[in-house]
């Protein structure tokens, strides 16, 4: 059944998860589906970036650990990671601040599923920007992008399982290359006309309900 296959895909995401402690002293801030783009009309993150930066500064100063649960980068509509980094330089600097402090971890989603390739972090995330002296600065060297994170409850053994969630949907998991093609060449142009992407559970209530029922 579809439910059984969804369960298998979700279980697979937790075969080699990142394990983090959960107790009365740990503090986590969770972000998902930022979909950082290249600054064009389809960049849904752009208008919220100031709020994002303000919240990251607040949570950093208060000792939180940053968890990004997938689709941080819109790599279905856009091909260039470099352009995304250039457009949202301040956001990347803020994340780098957490990472340098050992307080940033990331899960890949369907729209940035290419991050699961081992060479991808080395190519795109080792360095990020140039400072005022034109010296290239480190971003997140040796970063790992996980399929899932488990917060291990050290008090009541009630662990919290974190993943992006696309594993529950066949079109956005196993058939993601097809979905990317449809988004990049069909739904992206139509979105500019105000027509929502039907492959997205976030923009399609019927798909959203079905995905939630499978989890």
Set out the residue ranges of the language-model regions.
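Compositionally biased, intrinsically disordered low-complexity segments enriched
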Residues: 4, 37, 113, 166-168
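Alpha/beta-hydrolase fold active-site loops
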Residues: 26, 158-160
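Short, flexible active-site-adjacent loop segments at beta-strand->alpha-helix junctions, enriched
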Residues: 110, 155, 164-167
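Acidic, histidine-bearing metal-coordination/catalytic regions of metal-dependent phosphoesterases
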Residues: 1-27
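Core catalytic region of metal-dependent phosphoesterases/phosphodiesterases
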Residues: 25-27, 31, 36-153
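Generic hydrophobic, helix-prone segments enriched in Leu/Val/Ile
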Residues: 1-2, 10, 59, 84, ...
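Active-site-proximal loop/helix segment associated with metal-binding centers of metalloenzymes
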Residues: 160-215
């Amino acid at each position: 059944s579809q439910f059984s296959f969804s369960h298998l895909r979700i279980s697979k995401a937790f075969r080699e998860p990142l394990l983090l402690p959960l107790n009365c002293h740990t503090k986590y801030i969770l972000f998902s589906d930022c979909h950082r783009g290249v600054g064009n009309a389809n960049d849904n993150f752009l208008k919220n970036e100031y709020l994002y930066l303000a919240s990251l500064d607040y949570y950093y100063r208060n000792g939180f650990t940053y968890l990004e649960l997938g689709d941080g980068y819109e790599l279905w509509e856009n091909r260039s990671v470099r352009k995304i980094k250039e457009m949202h330089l301040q956001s990347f600097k803020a994340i780098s601040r957490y990472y340098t402090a050992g307080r940033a971890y990331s899960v890949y989603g369907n729209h940035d599923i290419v991050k699961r390739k081992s060479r991808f972090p080395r190519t795109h995330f080792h360095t990020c920007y140039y400072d005022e002296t034109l010296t290239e600065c480190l971003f997140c060297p040796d970063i790992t992008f996980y399929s899932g994170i488990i917060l291990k409850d050290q008090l009541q053994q009630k662990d919290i399982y974190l993943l992006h969630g696309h594993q529950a949907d066949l079109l956005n998991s196993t058939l993601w290359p097809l979905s990317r093609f449809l988004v990049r060449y069909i739904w992206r142009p139509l979105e500019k006309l105000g027509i929502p992407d039907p492959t997205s559970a976030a923009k399609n209530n019927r798909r959203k309900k079905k995905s939630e029922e499978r989890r």
